[in-house]
Amino acid sequence: VRKGMTKPLKLNPPQLLALMFLFLVVVGGVLLKLPIATEKDISWLDAFFLSTSAATVTGLAPIDPGSTFTLFGEIVLMVLIQVGGLGIMTFAVLVVIVLGKKIGMKQRMLMQEALNQPSLGGVIRLARNLLLFSLLMELVGATLLAIDWVPKMGWAKGLYYSLFHTIASFNNAGFALWPDNLSRFVGDPIVNMTVSLLVIIGGLGFTVVFDVLYQRRWRKLSLHTKLMLVMTLIVNVLAIVAIFLFEHNNPKTLGSLSLSEQLWASYFQGITPRTAGFNTIDIGSLDQPTAMFMIFLMFVGAGSTSTGGGIKLTTFAVIVFAVVSFLKGKEETVIWQRTIRHTIILRALAIASMSMLFIFVVTLALTLTEDASVLALLFEVVSAFGTVGLSMNLTPHLSMIGKVLIICVMLFGKLGPLTLVYSIAKPKKTNIRYPNGDILTG
């Protein structure tokens, strides 16, 4: 072997996960482009757009999936949603366990990164429990939807549609097989409750769900779990009330519905914008205040280690508490008698700042390439970033450049700003300490 030959490329866990995810998107795009997958031919760009949308559990679609894809194509979408939602490494661990092989240290480190865990201890057991819990929830959800849909559609279609929409709901992907999404079920209690509860559970994050299942008492729950549960309740209630107040006089959305349908629609649309892009009213007809409020919800997003996107609800909560502490003149940020480390606050600020800058730059770029209002463009970008999937009817009309930009935003939103930064840069620790310097701010 000659000296000076290049060393084999060593990838850290974030880089490996990013590459594995891109590989999933490419394979999905190729499968969706196959003649067996479509009723009518679609472009390569649309195939990769939909593959990215499914793998990132977003739900934005330039074409109607229900009328475009064959059963094979829809199953490919379903698999992409499931693998993308629960994580590639989680499924890789399942395969290794089934084959009866040992899981090495490198695989455990990948699992630790994928599941966002502070240590290696118990990550394999956690992955197995995550899979079992997910499959159980999807079985329950599919059964509930089947009770409503089988009598209306027949056994085969009813069961299949129940399974597809349950997987999409639990993984917080707003894909539906009807051109109007779920608008035809605006007043249906079973559909509204089943889909919304699956979305909430999927959006809480498995660490919260398992903490609640194992501890069962409020006192024993971790600070993260308590914060997620309280913030989820507050944000959901505020969203439901706000949407009802903003839209109840709009004849194109809630105004034309009965009072019970208005209440169901407000409830459903209040819960889904943070994580899953299902809709029972026409999003393109929303009044401007509602659209702006939904942009905020989509930006905040779901919980850490969940199937949803956004900057994450706890990130937003930490920033709010830190700002309040600063305004009160306190040097430390305290949440329920627990001091939050400065590194966590800086991490939250970094995530929010990078995300806002990225959204601004992409929205600015889209104003140059697309013929649409700034509000519709911002809505589309934040929906892609939050891996939500709601659109003001803009996705089918995007230009080629516009679609490529939205694909990039969906990937950025799914992988997360810090994961991408760690993939590119190698964080270095230094023992050098410099004297303090003062800078005027504000």
Set out the residue ranges of the language-model regions.
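Membrane-proximal intracellular helices of multi-pass ion channels
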Residues: V1-G442
